[in-house]
């Protein structure tokens, strides 16, 4: 049993026009072979995301929870990642997006707010540390999955949408890195220099 504790209660919960504000993240890691070029990414298998089971259920979700009035939306996402999934890392400041949703469970729906609606901010979290002990470890299981598996097993449609946006962002970033590597290789082939007007910092 964990000696750490998770926040409970709704005394500090933030709301926006009767929508309960929620913050969460998609924890991820890149699995690379030792001899593999660190800039290449096989998005089917090398990019993995961490999902967790819901309490008393076997379906899978990403860590998320109420955004409270004594923290920023980024702090809330980091806290939920630690409390629910037992991970810490580098949280990207730009959100993947904001999703409005209603829970299919009437009990959770009532907990969301008077109208049953929530507004969820989702971020990408590059995992740097997996804790052996974390607040909700007795109620949740962790599973690393590739993106295809995660899309198939994800419980909520809005989380699937967030995952698709996450994949788009990562694929875009991977393409940018490959372009930067190509420019670097060309510039080192001989004495010819690339016109600095066509070089970009990424």
From Swiss-Prot:
* Thermal dependence of catalysis: Optimum temperature is 37 degrees Celsius.
State the deletion phenotype.
No visible phenotype under normal growth conditions.
Motif Nudix box residues? 65-86
User: Where found, per UniProt?
Assistant: Mitochondrion
Q: What is its EC number?
A: 3.6.1.-
The record's top EC class is hydrolase
Q: How is its activity regulated?
A: Inhibited by fluoride.
Q: In which tissues is it expressed?
A: Expressed in roots, leaves, stems and inflorescences.
Sites binding Mg(2+) sit at 80, 84
Can you list the GO cellular component terms from the UniProt entry? mitochondrion
Identify the domain of life: Eukaryota
Residue intervals of the Nudix hydrolase domain = 18-167
GO MF assignments: bis(5'-adenosyl)-pentaphosphatase activity; hydrolase activity; metal ion binding
Q: Which cofactor does it need?
A: Mg(2+)
Subunit-level organization: Monomer.
Which PANTHER family does the entry link to?
DIPHOSPHOINOSITOL POLYPHOSPHATE PHOSPHOHYDROLASE (PTHR12629), NUDIX HYDROLASE 13, MITOCHONDRIAL (PTHR12629:SF76)
What family classification does the UniProt entry report for this protein? Belongs to the Nudix hydrolase family.
Q: Briefly state the protein's biological role.
A: Mediates the hydrolysis of some nucleoside diphosphate derivatives. Can use diadenosine 5',5'''-P(1)P(6) hexaphosphate (Ap(6)A), diadenosine 5',5'''-P(1)P(5) pentaphosphate (Ap(5)A) and adenosine tetraphosphate (p(4)A) as substrates, but not diadenosine 5',5'''-P(1)P(4) tetraphosphate (Ap(4)A), diadenosine 5',5'''-P(1)P(3) triphosphate (Ap(3)A), deoxyribonucleoside triphosphates, ribonucleoside triphosphates, diphosphoinositol pentakisphosphate (PP-InsP(5)) and 5-phospho-alpha-D-ribosyl diphosphate (PRPP).
Can you name this protein? Nudix hydrolase 13, mitochondrial
Q: Can you name the source organism?
A: Arabidopsis thaliana (Mouse-ear cress)
User: Corresponding gene?
Assistant: NUDT13
